[in-house]
Amino acid sequence: QLVYYKYGQTLFNGGLAVWEDDVNQGKGDSFGIESVYEYSNGDWYGKASYTLSKTTRYGFPDVLDGAEFHARFDRRHVLNATVMWKGASIAFTLQGGNWENAAPEKYPMHTFGEYEWTASYFSGVNNYRMPMVLRLDLGYQYRFATKHVHHELNIGIYNVTNHFNPFMLYFDTSTESWRMLALLPILPN
């Protein structure tokens, strides 16, 4: 059973109502297949996995009249690969982007008088897929011991390719355009 808040509702209503009255209840389906390959030989270790999946939501009476729509985290393709040799490691990730709510269309609205404003049109729920996420990380683990203590030093670089991996879509009112927000560019670890 899945839930969505009804428009304008909040759980912080002082206990005056049951929380179930503030949400729409619906269903969801998730299908997929995953393949994993693992290799180990002496100092070498490698692992690769691929997932093909589809996740949808439906049956919410107040959301698209119960029609099916993409789940926010419906990522059709996910590929992960890791290779380690002695203390060095490489990790690669490639996956489909999240689904977001976007209003790609606008139209002018007129009121009585001279006031005019622009309205955004949302054609559906989770109607825009964000770009693919691509990341390559490098790392090195150095182990050493002193007389009584074992030490481990880990150094690395996160997102070596400095790929712009957006995770959120928002509307910038100053430029009146949709913008993507990404965190963590190339970063020492």
Question: What is each residue range found by the language model?
Answer:
Residues 23-24, 80, 126, 159-165:
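Asparagine-centered polar/low-complexity signal
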Residues 7-9, 14-15, 42-43, 87, ...:
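Intrinsic-disorder/low-complexity loop/linker signature
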Residues 67-69, 122-128, 177-179:
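Active-site rim elements
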Residues 1, 93-116, 131-135, 141-189:
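C-terminal beta-signal and adjacent terminal beta-strands/loops
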Residues 26-28, 72-73, 129-134, 181-182:
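Aromatic-acidic/polar surface patches that form glycan- and anion
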Residues 11-18, 56-65, 114-122, 169-172:
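Flexible, solvent-exposed coil segments and beta strand-coil junctions
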Residues 4-6, 17-104:
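Gram-negative outer-membrane beta-barrel transporters
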Residues 3, 8, 12, 26, ...:
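Generic, ordered loop/turn and secondary-structure boundary motif
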